[in-house]
Amino acid sequence: MTRSVWKGPFVDGYMLNKADASRASGRNEIIKIWSRRSTILPQFVGLTFGVYNGRKFLPVQVTENMVGHKFGEFSPTRTFNGHAADKKAKRG
């Protein structure tokens, strides 16, 4: 079920403050965030966020196509190493 339209997008408050401070400084440094649940807003376009995936911060450069999505969509938490090989087929 999607979020109600009347509620609006969810963004943690500290992220707005960090984004405004980064824009004011003019330096394009990585903004570390832990909030994977926050929605990407149009004012974040052009900024680089370090999204925490449980182990490390993955850099995410925000583009216009990402607006409306969540930060967690661009920082995978699991690594897929492939399925186990069939041992009987290898012995031949």
From Swiss-Prot:
> GO:BP terms for this protein?
ribosomal small subunit assembly; translation
Its signal peptide is: none
UniProt keyword terms in alphabetical order: Ribonucleoprotein, Ribosomal protein, RNA-binding, rRNA-binding
A Pfam family annotated for this UniProt entry: Ribosomal_S19
Annotated Gene Ontology cellular component terms: cytoplasm; small ribosomal subunit
The record's listing under InterPro entries reads:
Ribosomal_uS19 (IPR002222), Ribosomal_uS19_bac-type (IPR005732), Ribosomal_uS19_CS (IPR020934), Ribosomal_uS19_SF (IPR023575)
Give GO terms: molecular function aspect only.
Answer: rRNA binding; structural constituent of ribosome
User: Which SUPFAM superfamilies does the entry mention?
Assistant: Ribosomal protein S19
Q: Which Gene3D superfamilies does the entry link to?
A: 30s Ribosomal Protein S19, Chain A (3.30.860.10)
Concerning its family, UniProt says:
Belongs to the universal ribosomal protein uS19 family.
Q: What does this protein do?
A: Protein S19 forms a complex with S13 that binds strongly to the 16S ribosomal RNA.
HAMAP family annotated for this entry? Ribosomal_uS19
Q: PANTHER family under this entry?
A: RIBOSOMAL PROTEIN S19P FAMILY MEMBER, SMALL RIBOSOMAL SUBUNIT PROTEIN US19M
Protein's name according to its UniProt entry? Small ribosomal subunit protein uS19
Organism whose genome encodes this protein = Acidiphilium cryptum (strain JF-5)
> Gene encoding this chain?
rpsS
